[in-house]
Amino acid sequence: MTQLLRPEAVENLLGEVPNWKLRENSIERTFKFSGFQEAIDFVNRVAQEAESMNHHPDIDIRWNKVKLVLSTHSAGGLTNNDFMLATKVDKLA
């Protein structure tokens, strides 16, 4: 099982993904696009990356906005995998 991050490690890693917000046992970010198709294209790119890592975000799509929530459910909170995926997702936007 993947190891949970200590609070001080979470704070340090948040500095590397400044657009992500800490929410209890997860991090989240909302991305805004010009329209629905662009949002869906982004979700498809995220899905490919998530599959390659076998680490899947919670995704909420609202017309031109996509909210991603990252947490390692099997560990019950944040792990390095969440921050690795956040970094990769930021490059896809």
Positions of PLM-derived features:
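N-terminal first-folded block
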Residues: 1-36
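Short glycine-rich, polar/acidic loop-and-turn segments at beta strand-coil junctions
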Residues: 35, 46, 63-65, 72-74
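Flexible nucleotide-interacting loop at or near the entrance of a catalytic core
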Residues: 39
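C-terminal structural segments of small proteins and small subunits
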Residues: 67-92
